[in-house]
Amino acid sequence: MFKEAKLLTDALLLMALLWLISVVVALIEPRGTMARAGIVLGCAVGIAACLIGMPGESSTLSLGIRLSNTPVQFKLTAAALWLMFFGLLPAIFTARLGTNATSIGGRKCWYAGLGLTLLGAVGVLGLQDAMSFLIAWETMSIGGAVMIFGDGHAECPGTPVLFMLGLLEVGAVAILLALLLLGNQAGSCSFVGFHLANAAATPMSFLLGLLLLIGFGAKLGILPFYEWFPAAYGSGSGATGVVFSGIVLNAAFYALARGVLEWLPRVGIWTMSAAGIMIFAGVLTAILSIFNAFQEEDWRRMLSLSSAENAGVAVAVLGVSWLLLASGLPAQAALAWIVCLLHLAAHSLAKGTLFLTADGVNSMNGSYTIVQRGLLRNNPAVLGIGALFAAMSLAALPPMAGFVSEWYIFQTLFHGMQVKGLPARLTMTLAAAGLALVVAVALATFAKLFGIGLLGDGHVHTRRFARVRTAAIFILGSSVLVLAVGMPWWLHALGPASQAIFGVNAAAQMRDGWLLVPLSNKFAFISPTKMLVVCPLLALIPIALLLIGRRAFHVRRVPVWSGGRREDAREIATTSLAFSNALRTFYGFIYGPTHNLEREYDHGPYFVKRLIFNQEVAPIFGPYLFSPLVKAMRRVAETVSKLQSGYLNLYNALIGMLLVLILALALFYK
């Protein structure tokens, strides 16, 4: 046991050292090859460290420095190891493939940003004091911005990056305020003293819960913060999206979960109120995000909004766990907590697969637009298998890991009906209804992405995906199925994660042999492991019927029907807009769609030379929240700028007033 703990500690130190060296090397090396090798090796060491540590946790490692008179310590819990493992699996592939930036300088910048982001994410997962945690949080944000700048896909990347950083800094201020309030109550900046689980809930604890939700929700994309996702992701490459939707999202969620489940009170009406707000915020985020994802026509933007949707689902289930815990149901709360971890693991693998596919699509088509080009016809079958498994998981289709996590989510909500009180039960009911809508739209979204984005007649391109990319997509996509099929054994790694927080090993009650059960096999059960055996056998029936039928009925290929006229199938193929137009029209109160048709004439109004069609979807929060805030800040800036008068006496007076204020605080604040 001691040797394993020592090996785990050494592996974590080596991982961080490799990433730190890679950041420095990326800035001075001519081509960035060594930086890439260092980051890939660091990811491999990190994955090995997670495998060594699971199930269990790392020992507390002192880094030998102090911040604000608090020793900086590092420790990865069982949940942190789980999220780190499934975040690093896609990251190692994206580090190997790299960005598709055209310039060498851009690639070097991207690798430097990747190293910073990984260091920050691991710091968020493991650092044990407020000061170093905030440094890691900001490092993760800045690293992400550097990655987008390195990609160089947008003509003006500054606007989306600054919008992203601006909203993230709003969250950072909320986190800072929450940590200051918690530190003031604990008398220390160490997270060890933040444990107020047994304290009585007060309005202050309710405020702390909201601050944590706002702070970490800014990174997770909880409304209204998800509006930075499409622009920021759309300005970078798919490789950047892999990191953002993988280890970064996992780290932000873990920080939020640690805050609400370990730092805040677990009983009282104020706790239940904060949990209810978290549930509604998560469900509404998931609904709005997936609706907006469905109408997107860009791979990166669609997948980014899907990431916000999955983060919203995870936050909603986390709120359910908190509410169940406050209601005196620790076993059901532990079930919800483990379901969150399963959901994020499946999401990291599937989303990483599709972001890598998006970069391959860009290399073939020259853009990330979702359009039929028949890419699968000209590429190996393993590419389609990997992408299909990922799309099925995100659409919650059996037997993929996404289906397993969604099934567990609804079973958790059904268990949630055991709570006492009409408001709590009504919250569970509305959450179940909202998430059911999310699942339905997600199915349509990924049917559109896979069907239009990868299928078609196949007569446009003769090029193929790079072999390394094809292999990465297949391995990552297949790992989604491996996670689902091996779920009875994977759950063993999550027992300590629930035991440490809830005092209940819920993972042991979530499996019965090859069956997956929600705490009891008398409530419900599924078995992805058995599905893998049975489904291929059942598939033999339609395959046999097809083979028999082909003897009597020969295959005919005829042109697509188009009003009785012969049209080029490529010209009348289903477009992304056509696929989503029905839902866009039905839910027009959400989308606020606008269409604009302009005509250019030649020699009079009867001779149309060109039609220009433009369609847009009105943003929900932009005109009503962000724009008024920007205008208000500009007015404040104009008012404050009058203080810059150039008169030295005025400046001295302001300094004197500030000193008096500081003295007053020192004398009267207790």
Residue ranges and their predicted role:
Residues 2-14, 20-112, 188-196, 496, ...:
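Transmembrane helix-loop-helix hairpins at membrane boundaries of multipass inner-membrane proteins
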Residues 59-68, 192-197, 408-422, 490-524:
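Membrane-interfacial helical/loop segments at transmembrane boundaries in membrane proteins
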Residues 223, 351-355, 428-464, 533-558:
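Predominantly late transmembrane helices and immediately cytosolic-facing juxtamembrane segments
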